[in-house]
């Protein structure tokens, strides 16, 4: 069965700091699989751009079952030790519900602001993931990488999940797919079609070169959905799920095709105003989730 989650995107009014928590609680009540939060450091212009690790820590306190997905954390923004310790902390306080989505990012202004050369983002992501995996797996840890050196390091908070929280690697390039095969428990796409999912699966098998790592990977993606009767507040940054005028039937058909192509988890990104998010969740829960098999 395709596991369906919903994204808590940064469109919450600045003066309503509890809106995202209410929406997360509602998502759990409606039996969604997960909620997802992105990673922006500078104002996106959409509303409240909360830190994903901090916001999901708050979400973990008002939920008990819902999985918590960061989609995705820009790994080079954080020193490897800080990333590993923060993720392990959230893994512990959530009872093992964290899914750490990781990507290289793209925003040159944010890279300049954190003092990290954007040209190093791929190499830094690989370094930080390798270091984090080492810190999560053993204590003490020695590690030598191009950007991280550790000697007999003991992570302040060991994760509750053996080996650390599952890592979903975002990106469509060969470098991203190789990163998923090397470090990931899953691959995370954006706005994919069934043909693109099939293509990613084929490319992963080709790049795997017989190691068998591909067999452990979850294939997941964000999709863009504006339910009928609700106006879009911002343009969807990709192909709309169910077409330009979606119905329950067209959305279920699209999701079925994605599942047949190999997708096993899907996050609904809702380009709508904050006051309509719970109504949109209600529609998905009533009209879509019961038809997913």
Model regions: which residues?
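N-terminal beta1-alpha1-beta2 module of alpha/beta enzyme domains
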Residues: 1-62, 165, 271-279, 283
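Internal, glycine-rich beta/alpha segment that forms the wall or movable "lid"
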Residues: 2, 76-183, 198-207, 211, ...
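Hydrophobic faces of well-ordered beta-strands that scaffold small-molecule active sites
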Residues: 4-8, 35-37, 68-71, 98-102, ...
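Active-site mouth loops of central-metabolism enzymes
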Residues: 6-18, 73-81, 162-172, 235-249
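Short, acidic/polar
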Residues: 15-27, 82-86, 169-179, 246-258
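Catalytic domains of carbohydrate-active enzymes, especially glycoside hydrolases
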Residues: 21-38, 182-186, 257-266
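An alpha-helical appendage that flanks or caps ligand/catalytic pockets
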Residues: 119-160, 190-293
């Amino acid at each position: 069965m395709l596991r369906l989650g919903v994204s808590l995107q940064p469109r919450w009014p600045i003066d309503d700091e509890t809106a995202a928590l209410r929406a997360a609680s509602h998502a759990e009540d409606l039996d969604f699989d997960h909620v997802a939060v992105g990673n922006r450091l500078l104002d996106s212009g959409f509303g409240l751009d909360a830190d994903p690790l901090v916001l999901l820590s708050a979400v973990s306190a008002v939920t008990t079952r819902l999985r918590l997905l960061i989609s995705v954390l820009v790994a080079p923004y954080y020193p490897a030790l800080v990333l590993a310790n923060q993720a392990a902390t959230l893994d512990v306080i959530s009872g093992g519900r964290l899914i750490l989505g990781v990507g290289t990012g793209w925003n040159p202004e944010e890279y300049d602001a954190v003092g990290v050369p954007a040209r190093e983002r791929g190499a830094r992501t690989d370094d930080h993931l390798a270091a984090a995996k080492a810190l999560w797996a053993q204590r003490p840890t020695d590690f030598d990488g191009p950007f991280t050196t550790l000697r007999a390091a003991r992570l302040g908070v060991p994760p509750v999940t053996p080996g650390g929280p599952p890592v979903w690697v975002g990106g469509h390039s060969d470098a991203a797919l190789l990163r998923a095969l090397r470090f990931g428990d899953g691959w995370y796409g954006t706005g994919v079609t069934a043909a693109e999912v099939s293509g990613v699966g084929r490319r992963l098998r080709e790049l795997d070169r017989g190691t068998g790592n591909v067999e452990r990977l979850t294939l997941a993606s964000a999709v863009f959905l504006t339910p009928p009767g609700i106006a879009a507040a911002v343009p969807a940054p990709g192909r709309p799920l169910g077409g330009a005028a979606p119905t329950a039937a067209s959305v279920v058909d699209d999701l079925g095709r994605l599942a047949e192509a190999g997708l096993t988890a899907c996050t609904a990104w809702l380009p709508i105003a904050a006051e309509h998010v719970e109504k949109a969740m209600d529609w998905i829960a009533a009209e879509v989730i019961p038809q997913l098999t």
